[in-house]
Every structure is written in C-alpha cells, then in structure tokens.
C-alpha cells in the first residue's frame, strides 16, 4: 500500500504558527481566518513558514490556510518515528515513493565528504541522517507491505537477474538539453522532485541507452554487447535511485505489470 504521513522539520513553521494561533484563541470563523491571512503578510521574510506560504498548495486559499494552521489534530513523524510506527502496525517498509531525496548516493550528498560516512550506516539510519541533513521535508510517502507478506519486492543489481529487468520510465521523467554540466549530453530529472540538486547527468552513450527505454525491452536487449553490461548496470541502477524508472522484474513470466 501507499502510505503518506507529515514530516516534522519542513513543517516547523506550521507548528510555530499553530501555537501562535492557539495562544491568541483564534477560531475558524470566516472573519478570524481573513484576519489571520492578513496578519501573515507581516511575517518576517526569514520565518520558517515563508517557504510554505510561497510554495505549498495548502496556503493558496483561506480553507487550506485554516486546515493547515487551525487543525486541532496533526501528528508528524520523523523517519525513525515513521519506521517504528510501521513496525507497531504490523507493516514492513518497502521503499520511498520518491527515494532520491533520502539517498546519499543522489544529489549534492553524492559528492560530499560525508557520503562515505553515510554509506557505512545501516539503511534506516541512513534515511534518518539524510532527513536531518536536508531539513525541509514536509511529508514522507512510502510503499509498505504487511510484515508477513513474501519479500519479493527488494530490487537488487548485485546478482545476475538485473539484465532481465524491463525498465519503464516514470511519467514525471523528462530529458533536459539546456544549461548542461560539463561532459553531459543531457540531464534527466523527475518533475515531482522538490530539491533542485536531484538530477542525473547523462553522457552521450548513457543518453542513447536511456532513449532506448520503451517499457518492453529488457536491459540486456537495450545493451546487448558484453562491453555495455557494466556501464548499463551503473546507469539503470542510477536511474532507479533517482526515481526516473521502475522495473518489471518478471520478464520470464510474460512481462506482466
């Protein structure tokens, strides 16, 4: 199942203003909400709520404003709290719906001096550390399973099965050809990402392999030459980490999806 919860650090401004409204006894009548909206215009420009006022859909109308700042019940979960919640509910974590923001292999952290230290951590601690580093996540969305469900969902590029994976582009994936970093023939991004450092440069041979993805052919069919196999493995694992593709891992069973 797909499960979404609020995250605490990116919503710090909401909780500050919620406490502010509670102290003033601000209610949910139309005049009170209008006065609240007008008062928010006086917020300091560096207030933690300002990025959400600019970007979050919750603040585009008075009803959304009231729901965000005056809702009596709201629970946010850090990564460790979310994973503990899953365990207590008899659920098992599968993957983040958009995982790149949680991975030290992706974005600015990939070239950080701390990347090797992060990679030494167990996976769950890695996610928690990257959440703290980014500091502005407003929600966590994950694919989860019942704890007793068969564990057939872990994707692995370390064995011999990956050449049989069928890559499928995600609908928010786009190829960009403007303002490229040195040596790149294109950059692939996922439009649903909110962090601007999460993009994957492609060299010309990688771009050719990426453009061959059609949702029908396996990696081995896209990169049939032996010399292409290792570069293809690196590329397609990177595309998966960066939320650019998913895989049909059952091509021998009729490639069902």
Which positions does each model-derived feature cover?
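Substrate-binding/catalytic lobe of Class I Rossmann-like enzymes that use SAM or dcSAM, i.e.
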Residues: 1, 16, 20-113
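Acidic carboxylate diad motif detector
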Residues: 3-7
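Hydrophobic packing positions characteristic
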Residues: 94-184
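Long, charge-rich, low-complexity alpha-helical segments
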Residues: 104-145, 195-257
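Short alpha-helical segments that sit at the start of domains
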Residues: 176-207
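Phosphate-handling architecture centered on phosphoinositide signaling
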Residues: 10
């Amino acid at each position: 199942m797909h499960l979404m919860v609020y995250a605490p650090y990116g919503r710090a401004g909401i909780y500050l203003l919620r406490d502010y409204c509670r102290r003033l006894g601000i209610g949910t009548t139309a005049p009170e909400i209008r006065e609240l909206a007008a008062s928010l215009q006086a917020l300091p420009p560096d207030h933690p709520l300002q990025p959400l006022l600019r970007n979050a859909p919750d603040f585009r109308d008075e009803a959304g404003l009231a729901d965000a700042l005056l809702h009596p019940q709201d629970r946010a979960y850090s990564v460790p709290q979310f994973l503990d919640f899953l365990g207590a509910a008899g659920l098992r974590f599968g993957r983040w719906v958009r995982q790149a923001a949680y991975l030290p292999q992706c974005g600015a952290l990939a070239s950080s001096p701390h990347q090797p230290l992060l990679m030494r951590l167990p996976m769950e601690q890695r996610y928690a550390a990257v959440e703290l580093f980014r500091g502005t996540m407003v929600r966590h969305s994950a694919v989860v399973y019942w704890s007793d469900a068969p564990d057939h969902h872990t994707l692995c590029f370390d064995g011999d099965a990956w050449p049989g994976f069928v890559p499928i582009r995600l609908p928010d994936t786009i190829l960009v050809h403007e303002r490229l970093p040195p040596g790149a023939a294109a950059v692939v991004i996922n439009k649903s990402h909110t962090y601007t450092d999460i993009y994957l440069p492609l060299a010309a041979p990688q771009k050719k392999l990426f453009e061959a993805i059609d949702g029908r052919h396996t990696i081995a069919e896209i990169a049939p030459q032996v010399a292409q196999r290792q570069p293809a493995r690196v590329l397609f694992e990177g595309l998966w980490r960066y939320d650019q593709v998913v895989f049909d891992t059952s091509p021998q069973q009729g490639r069902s999806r």
